Amino acid sequence: MLGKEEEQQYGQNGKGMENELPFMKRPWFKKAYENAIEFHEKDELLDARDRLELSKAYRSIAKAEMWGGWLGFSAVFLTPFAYRYYKTKAIKGVKVPRNFVLGVMALFFATNFAGRSMYTRQLNERDPTGVLKDNYSNKYGDNDFGAFQHDQTKEIPRNQRQYNMMRLLDSGSPSRWSMYFYITYQNPERRLPDPKVKLQQMKKGGVFNGSPFMNQRDPIGLYRNKGRKSPDPIEGEQNDSPVLSSWEKIRNGDNSSSSSWENIRNTSRDQSQESDASVDHESDIFISGFSDDGNATDNSSSDDKYQRLLQSGRYGGNRS
């Protein structure tokens, strides 16, 4: 139910914009608007620790639904096979389609039962005496949210804040709420926006962009370095030269316009020329090595002849 001041304000705003926003008079919109305000009031009271604990609580509910559902399916689907094998040592004769349909039905019932059981367990952990259950009220506007300040989070016990939020959300979509509370625990700015502000923006004709959590490019935080502007490859150095057609490139002798086969032939020709050059270089080295050896032998033979002439001259002089 709306407070008196909020009812008057809501009525005045609605009357002023009846022609522009006719859907605001419908019951489904009023109900959704009330639920959004109630959620926003309770969400503003949560601190980082509350969000982390609520994320763990709803994650445990999601796990309970998963394991409970598959255990129920396995129990109904596999029991006839086990019984048949125990009696006849074979699994022939079991009606598989019937077992599968019954297993799917058991999957849904077991999922709901396991999730509800874990949800009740999480509530009892936050309200072991049952006092919060007796004093719980799901009517928004009771705590004068317009005068809300952050210091009021200390006045409400932690278990009561978490209990009120879980009673409001119930046990539906536990995976989504677990992700929401964990992401807002890491970054509080990604909380759902104030529905009153969004309603005023819609009335003024502004564009409704949705919440920073549900309507964005990266809701789960997969991308890093948010806010950094990526360089635009188009804004780089621009080539002012005119664009030439293929025939103009051929006339100008542009090699870049050659076909792929011509590029392959050119590369193979270059490789063959390089291999021939390397072979010539090796042969030059080989020949130069032999020439050096020949010069060395020639020099050694001339030295021997010179020594022999000297010795013969000495001996001839002595004899004379």
From Swiss-Prot:
Annotated Basic and acidic residues bias: 267-284
Location of region: Disordered: 205-320
Protein's UniProt keywords contain Acetylation: no
Residue stretches in coiled coil: none
Classification via Pfam families: DUF1689
Phosphoserine: residues bearing it: 230
Other known facts: Present with 922 molecules/cell in log phase SD medium.
Family designation: Belongs to the PUP1 family.
Protein name: PUP1 protein homolog
Biological source species: Saccharomyces cerevisiae (strain ATCC 204508 / S288c)
